[in-house]
């Protein structure tokens, strides 16, 4: 073990692997991508559509004279109008103005002028990689989509079961029509499918590309055949020979001859070694082509045939046909592979290209030749190479691509998603620009600002941020939740998969995920495998492919040189694990090493190892790397552990885990909640709200400003700020006056952080023991001690707001003068009718007094005068005050009032906005959900006095009793090892770091624990021979020892956001739905419990007629009946019989709406009016 500093805490580290690379900034991908969008992305779009030219009619000369040209030169970002906090308070979007410099040229005179135009506001990313949209903090999630390029895949045929799958070469562009080349092994024919329509013979398309002659076509599929093997030659009988066959003195067959049996025998007997023949599939395709279209079809005919198939209704003309096909695949306006797609195609077809040059073009090629096409449209060669490769695949199915390989998927980050939206908007503007330009006749009158419609741009971008599936309300329960949200990869969203159509294979873990995408962290519901998380070291290259770092290994020696590889590049190498044994000089100790190669595990000599992984952590995401002893947990439970850490509510006094993994400090550093020192310096002043640090140089001397004063950095801390999920952000200083801090040191803790480390829960003393059935089936028994110590008490901040508007009957008013309200309810309000800060409020209390005018039509002028004189406001206004909802109590910690002047952006008719923040203290309670880090979750079943809890031989009571049956079947033994090591930490007063896959071993822990317990005198139940970490506990109620020794120790427990108090709900009378007149549902609407169809059957089965009657009528939608019952209960009378439920009336109305004449009669045959029943 060695010691190391994590944040401001020293830990003992068990890990043996020394990582050559620090974990990179965890939100760097988001920040870099947004920076790229501002610096390059915006301009790329503008450049793509410039110059914009217009033709104008000048009065003094000929028509259609040269007009103006607009060119976009550069972009500039202004300063935000409001700061982040103001945007949150006022419900605005945090954005910056975008200015574009436009160069206008008069094409007639050559005059040039440059102008800067305002192009609207762009939502701007905060330093924490979030956006503030309409006052709410949001995150743009990275999207994982199929990369454009060419794919070679097999598709099962719909024909009979014995048929072979069809092989497809699929060209997938970013924009434009698909092109699929198909090889059908059942029909022995090459086909092409243009734009997902009908299939046709491939040679028809090749004819249009200029391969007129049949021999030219077959040349593309030439291959060498062994001329000495007669059997092989006989298989090719009927093929056309593609080059002259000659011996030294005789020409046996010339190019173009058909190979017959006699000729085959003759060739086999001669001394010719190799002859050039077309591949059998090409030959059969040609025959099929001739059968369908005849033998002498020209390229014009081919164009016409294709046009006929694609546009059956139109008259085929040669020019129209040529243009149609050209526009489909060869025009940059209609078709685009993008840079990424071209890069993928070039690398995929490189081998085929090399072979094509050798075989078809018969040229000498260097080994390292590249397929260096640069055009982003389809080229003839792409089609030819793909077809040729497809023909080879028939006998080499192992060369097919896997759709789910990460090499074929790319990540669309924030920058790219915003660029796409900007381009969508700009295309609309571009068309308008062209039209508007033609209006101007004089150069001096052209002003860009008048040409650009800013609204279009802003609406499109705003719509994306407000409504896109990829723009999500930020998960802010704790710092880890926020960090993970920004590192999320989603396969769903526009242009991605749909939840319903996602196959099992797409969701599954793939070997190419290694080091790029976490195989563990993913949701448990419908999105399993579609929403994933980036691995700790993963980064993204310029094309959007995921990269992971490796160390180079040369001749069995590990170097410190690091290379980043994409998933498809990695397939070529032998890669060793990071945990293999290496001596001090970097030489691999074992002579034979286990390596990964192309998704397989194999053993090779150490000299053949090419690369080595950086760290055992590199496989998993940040959340998962926070689970100690992950290697001892089942993957399903680790998944739950990863997900539940994100749901841990920040407790009042955060406590870092005794048993950590070493990643805690890094997660806290990048979460943005820990305040880090920007410069080296000395702490001059500290209080709970701000820290002042005076900068110093290397020698400790103060750094002075130009005026000779020492430079001071002031850090303002956040105090009790509400998050998106109503948890609390509160920062506390962790430095003292006079302390020297280095640049990057933590100087203040945030929520769920302790001494600069992530601290999501508490270290709790636990025992694994069944206790009177109170911990049956994952229930948890808790000691009263945890309540007294406020261990799991959390603070939640609720925000309530109300708006005073102008109504048709007059303005609403915020006032303390509310009609028919007792003095008791007004005691906490100030003279303006707004609750005072510091007041303790509970459900039903008034937070903001508000009255709304209600219309009264029968007021005579005399009444109006009397009212205005005596100020009798009682009858013309109704009380619409903001009240504390049911089940909430707490202290008012802040009130914000905004007047009309401050909130001009809020929309018309709003006079005042009041926001009241109430902090609620929620101690641990029965029904709350607790969990460990290993997916071991449970619900508190009972809280019993400390003196009744089982206790150690030295009298220490345990704090939580867990069921031992929760461990074996779930296979998350990590929790038991954590418990032992945690106890060792508590006894020796140490903190540990046990990195995943490289942590403490069981015997190490037991050895040390036995020593520590012996020293403390609590080694009863543990023998020197068989160290098991168990102890003889006594029952707190009787004082008698339990029958067997019990595992006790310290486990890190989290209180999750599923708090019983927030979920419990009861209703007596409440709101009803407008049409059905049935009670609403759900706690939010103060609704009732649904008594559904099956529940009705249950009561019917029991014969509970009166109960059933009541449930279906007066408790539901019999309006008259429920009022009568209410009166009867108040007056103590018998409950009257039921009336007619509203649902009956609704049914009648619906049937009448279907034009059926339905009427209702009483028993005497008199017609009744449904509306009056």
Swiss-Prot record:
GO biological process entries: DNA-templated transcription
Gene label: rpoB
Entry's family note: Belongs to the RNA polymerase beta chain family.
Record lineage: Bacteria, Thermotogati, Thermotogota, Thermotogae, Kosmotogales
MF terms (GO), sorted A to Z: DNA binding; DNA-directed RNA polymerase activity; ribonucleoside binding
Keyword Transferase included in the entry's annotation: yes
Domain of life: Bacteria
Function: DNA-dependent RNA polymerase catalyzes the transcription of DNA into RNA using the four ribonucleoside triphosphates as substrates.
A GO term from the CC aspect: DNA-directed RNA polymerase complex
UniProt organism field: Kosmotoga olearia (strain ATCC BAA-1733 / DSM 21960 / TBF 19.5.1)
UniProt keyword Iron, yes or no: no
Reactions the enzyme catalyzes: RNA(n) + a ribonucleoside 5'-triphosphate = RNA(n+1) + diphosphate
Entry EC no(s): 2.7.7.6
UniProt KW keywords: DNA-directed RNA polymerase, Nucleotidyltransferase, Transcription, Transferase
InterPro entries registered for this protein in UniProt: DNA-dir_RNA_pol_bsu_ext_1_sf, DNA-dir_RNA_pol_bsu_external_1, DNA-dir_RNA_pol_su2, DNA-dir_RNAP_su2_dom, DNA-dir_RNAP_su2_hyb_sf, RNA_pol_bsu_bac, RNA_pol_bsu_CS, RNA_pol_bsu_protrusion
Protein name as annotated: DNA-directed RNA polymerase subunit beta
């Amino acid at each position: 073990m060695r010691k190391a500093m994590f944040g401001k805490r020293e830990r003992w580290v068990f890990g043996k692997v020394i990582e050559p690379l620090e974990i990179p900034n965890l939100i760097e991908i988001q920040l870099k991508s947004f920076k790229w969008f501002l610096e390059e992305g915006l301009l790329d779009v503008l450049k793509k559509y410039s110059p914009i030219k217009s033709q104008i009619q000048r009065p003094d000369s000929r028509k259609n004279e040269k007009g103006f040209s607009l060119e976009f030169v550069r972009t500039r970002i202004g300063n935000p109008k409001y700061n982040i906090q103001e945007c949150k308070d006022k419900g605005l979007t945090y954005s910056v103005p975008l200015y574009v410099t436009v160069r206008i040229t008069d094409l007639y005179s050559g005059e040039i002028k440059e102008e800067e135009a305002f192009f609207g506001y762009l939502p701007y990313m905060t330093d924490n990689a979030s956006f503030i949209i309409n006052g709410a903090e949001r995150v743009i999630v990275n999207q994982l989509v199929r990369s454009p390029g060419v794919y070679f895949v097999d598709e099962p045929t719909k024909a009979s079961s014995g048929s072979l799958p069809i092989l497809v070469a699929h060209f997938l562009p970013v924009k434009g029509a698909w092109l699929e080349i198909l090889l059908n092994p059942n029909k022995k024919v090459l086909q092409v499918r243009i734009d997902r329509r009908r299939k046709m013979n491939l040679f028809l398309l090749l004819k249009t590309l200029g391969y007129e002659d049949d021999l030219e076509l077959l040349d593309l599929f030439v291959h060498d055949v062994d001329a000495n093997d007669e059997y092989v030659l006989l298989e090719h009988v009927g093929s056309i020979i593609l080059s002259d066959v000659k011996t030294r003195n005789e020409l046996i067959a010339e190019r173009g001859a058909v190979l017959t049996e006699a000729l085959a025998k003759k060739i086999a007997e001669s001394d010719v070694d190799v002859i050039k023949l077309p591949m059998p599939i090409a030959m059969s395709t040609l025959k099929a082509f001739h059968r369908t279209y005849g033998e002498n079809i020209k390229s014009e005919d081919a164009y016409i045939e294709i046009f006929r198939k694609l546009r059956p209704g139109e008259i085929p003309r040669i020019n129209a046909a040529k243009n149609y096909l050209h526009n489909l695949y060869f025009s940059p306006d209609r078709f685009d592979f993008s840079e990424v797609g071209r890069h993928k195609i070039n690398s995929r077809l490189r081998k085929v290209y090399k072979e094509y040059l050798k075989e078809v073009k018969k040229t000498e090629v260097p080994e390292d030749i590249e397929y260096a096409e640069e055009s982003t449209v389809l080229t003839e060669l792409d089609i030819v190479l793909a077809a040729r490769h497809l023909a080879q695949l028939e006998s080499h199915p192992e060369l097919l691509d896997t759709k789910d390989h990460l090499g074929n998927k790319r990540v669309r980050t924030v920058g790219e998603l915003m660029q796409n939206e900007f381009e969508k908007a700009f295309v609309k503007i571009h068309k308008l620009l062209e039209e508007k330009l033609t209006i101007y006749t004089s150069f001096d009158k052209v002003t860009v600002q008048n040409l650009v419609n800013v609204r279009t741009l802003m609406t499109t971008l705003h719509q994306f941020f407000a409504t896109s599936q990829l723009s999500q309300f930020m998960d802010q329960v704790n710092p880890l939740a926020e960090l993970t949200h920004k590192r999320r990869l989603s396969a769903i969203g526009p242009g991605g998969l749909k939840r319903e159509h996602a196959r099992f294979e797409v969701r599954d873990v793939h070997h190419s995920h290694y080091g790029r995408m976490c195989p563990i962290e993913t949701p448990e519901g419908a999105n399993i495998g579609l929403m994933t998380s980036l691995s700790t070291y993963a980064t993204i290259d310029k094309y959007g492919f995921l990269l992971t770092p490796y160390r180079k290994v040369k001749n069995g020696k590990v170097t410190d040189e690091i290379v980043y590889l994409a998933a498809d590049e990695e397939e070529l190498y032998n890669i060793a694990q990071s945990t293999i044994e290496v001596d001090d000089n970097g030489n691999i100790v074992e002579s034979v090493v286990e390596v990964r190669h192309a998704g397989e595990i194999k053993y090779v000599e150490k000299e053949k190892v090419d690369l080595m992984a950086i760290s055992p952590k590199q496989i998993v995401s940040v959340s998962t790397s926070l689970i100690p002893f992950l290697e001892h947990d089942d993957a399903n439970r680790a998944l739950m552990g990863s997900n539940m850490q994100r749901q841990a509510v920040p407790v009042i006094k955060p406590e870092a885990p005794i048993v950590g993994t070493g990643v805690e400090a890094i997660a806290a550093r990048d979460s943005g909640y820990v305040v880090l020192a920007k410069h080296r310096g000395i702490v001059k002043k500290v209080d709970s709200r701000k820290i002042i640090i005076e900068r110093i140089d290397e020698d400790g001397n103060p750094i002075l400003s130009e005026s000779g004063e020492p430079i001071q950095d002031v850090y303002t801390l956040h105090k009790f700020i509400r998050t998106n999920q109503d948890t609390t952000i509160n920062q506390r200083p962790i430095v003292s006056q006079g302390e020297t801090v280095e640049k990057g040191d933590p100087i203040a803790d945030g929520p769920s952080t302790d001494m600069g480390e992530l601290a999501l829960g508490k270290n709790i003393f636990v025992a694994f023991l069944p206790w009177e059935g109170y911990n049956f089936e994952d229930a948890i028994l808790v000691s009263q001690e945890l309540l007294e110590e406020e261990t799991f008490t959390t603070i939640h901040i609720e925000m309530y707001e109300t708006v005073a508007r102008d109504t048709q009957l007059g303005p609403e008013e915020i006032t303390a003068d509310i009609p028919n309200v007792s003095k008791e309810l007004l005691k906490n309000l100030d003279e303006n009718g707004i609750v005072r800060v510091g007041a303790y409020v509970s459900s039903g209390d008034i937070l903001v007094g508000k009255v709304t005018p209600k219309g009264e039509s029968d007021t005579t002028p005399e009444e109006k005068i009397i009212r205005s004189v005596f100020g009798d406001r009682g009858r013309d206004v109704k009380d619409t005050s903001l009240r504390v909802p049911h089940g909430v109590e707490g202290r008012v910690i802040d009130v914000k009032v905004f007047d009309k002047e401050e909130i001009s952006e809020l929309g018309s008719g709003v006079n005042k906005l009041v926001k009241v923040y109430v902090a609620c203290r929620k101690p641990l309670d029965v029904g709350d959900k607790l969990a460990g880090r290993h997916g071991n979750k449970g619900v508190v079943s009972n809280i019993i006095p400390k003196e009744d809890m089982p206790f150690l031989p030295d009298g220490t009571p345990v704090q939580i009793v867990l069921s031992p049956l929760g461990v074996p079947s779930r296979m998350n033994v990590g929790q038991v090892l954590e418990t032992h090591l945690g106890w060792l930490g508590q006894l020796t007063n140490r903190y540990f770091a046990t990195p995943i896959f490289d942590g403490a071993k069981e015997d190490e822990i037991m050895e040390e624990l036995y020593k520590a317990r012996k020293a403390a005198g609590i080694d009863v139940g543990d023998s020197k021979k068989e160290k098991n970490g168990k102890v003889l506990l006594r029952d707190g109620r009787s004082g008698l020892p339990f029958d067997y020794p019990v595992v006790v120790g310290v486990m890190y427990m989290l209180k999750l956001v599923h708090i019983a108090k927030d979920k419990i709900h009861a209703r007596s009378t409440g709101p009803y739905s407008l049409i059905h007149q049935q009670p609403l549902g759900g706690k939010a609407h103060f609704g009732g419990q649904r008594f559904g169809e099956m529940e009705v059957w249950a009561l019917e089965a029991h014969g509970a007629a009166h109960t059933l009657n009541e449930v279906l009528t007066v408790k539901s939608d019999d309006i008259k009946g429920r009022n009568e019952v209410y009166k009867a209960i108040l007056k103590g009378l018998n409950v009257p019989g039921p009336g007619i439920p509203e649902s009956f009336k609704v049914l009648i109305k619906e049937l009448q709406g279907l034009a059926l004449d339905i009427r209702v009669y009483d028993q005497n045959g008199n017609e009744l009016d449904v509306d009056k029943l």
